[in-house]
A protein has these predicted regions:
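C-terminal lobe helix-coil module of Hanks-type protein kinase domains
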Residues: 1-52
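Interfacial "cap-and-anchor" motif at the non-cytosolic start of specific transmembrane alpha-helices
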Residues: 258-312
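Hydrophobic alpha-helical transmembrane segments
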Residues: 105-120, 193-208, 270-291
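Regulatory extensions appended to serine/threonine kinase catalytic cores
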Residues: 54-115
Length: 323
């Protein structure tokens, strides 16, 4: 005989993999393995009519997002680390050239202070982000083995997953601000009182670099988690649990970070032009990197908005049909 678990033959090449799974579950020999209600089946069929949402919530087995299973934590950490490390390198050379070189006997102190701060800040921030990611994955793994997982907690974890990029950006920004305060205070105790402009320059440069670096983790982590972690959280639960408002909130947040991605580099360039008129290298780096980065972020922003529109439309249609 033919097993219902085997892939059906003679299907169109563009037949969605999830539609096949839905129909196979309808024909399961054991009633306990079928859909629990007509409403649940209707929701699944509604999903099949929304290809974009379907690809996000139930990615094909050959999708590269599916193949990344098990690598979520290191990849999220890497997405956050790269822009922050690049911003840190730029900030280090900028501060050394425009602040430290003009202070007597400050080179050794600056090296020791920046080494200490970086050795604390980067592992702490990246470790915290990795831990938040791991919590989501652990809940997803527990849900796979426990068919009676807490519905309310499942909704909370789904919302946390959607905001993972926002949390990453907030953690990064907070650490840059703390570093902006720690650098001048540490330098003050190491070599004595600094000029007032040095305190302002340290704080301002670190805050601006932090705000520039914050947009990249938001878009990178949000897009990645939406396609890799979020599907795992809803695999064994009703994907209609989340109200459309959750997607709308994330769309509004995306606009905030998009504006930040374009505005902050422009403000940084303007500040450099006013304070250091001869610093053509820094202005050039910010101009080129800011432009390329903003264009890249805009592309991700457009894709993310389309993904969220599809999920919001699906959620709205399913919720309206259940009323």
């Amino acid at each position: 005989g033919i097993s219902l678990a085997d892939p059906p033959q003679h299907l169109p090449s563009d037949c969605p993999e999830h539609l096949v799974s839905v129909l196979q579950k309808c024909l399961a020999p054991d009633p306990a393995h079928r859909w629990r209600s007509g409403a649940e089946l209707a929701s699944q069929l509604e999903l099949c009519l929304n290809p974009r949402a379907q690809q996000i919530l139930f990615p094909a087995s050959k999708s590269w997002f599916t193949k990344l299973k098990g690598w979520e934590v290191p990849l999220v950490v890497l997405i956050v680390a790269i822009p922050n490390i690049l911003a840190g390198i730029f900030n280090f050379f900028h501060n050394q050239k425009h602040i430290v070189e003009h202070l007597k006997n400050s080179q050794d102190a600056f090296w020791k202070i920046q080494s200490a701060i970086n050795m604390i800040a980067y592992p702490t921030g990246l470790g915290l982000i990795g831990w938040l990611t791991w919590l989501l994955l652990r809940f997803a793994a527990d849900s796979e083995t426990d068919s009676k997982s807490d519905l309310q907690k499942s909704i909370v974890m789904q919302k946390r997953c959607l905001r993972l990029g926002h949390y990453a950006a907030l953690i990064c920004t907070a650490e840059w601000i703390i570093a902006g305060i720690a650098y001048p205070i540490s330098m003050h105790y190491a070599i004595g009182s600094l000029p007032a402009t040095a305190y302002i320059h340290f704080l301002g440069s670190l805050i601006l670099c932090g705000l520039i670096a914050a947009s990249y983790p938001f878009f990178g982590v949000t897009y990645f988690s939406l396609h890799t972690i979020y599907p795992r959280l809803i695999q064994n639960s009703d994907f209609t649990q989340l109200a459309p408002d959750s997607y709308q909130q994330l769309k509004r947040l995306s606009w905030v970070y998009l504006i930040m991605a374009f505005l902050v580099p422009t403000l940084s360039i303007a500040s450099l032009a006013m304070i250091n008129l001869n610093d053509k290298i820094a202005i050039g780096i910010l101009t080129v990197a800011g432009t390329l980065g903003a264009v890249s972020i805009f592309r991700v922003f457009q894709t993310l908005q389309a993904d969220l529109d599809a999920l919001e439309e699906l959620s709205r249609r399913v919720h309206s049909s259940l009323k």
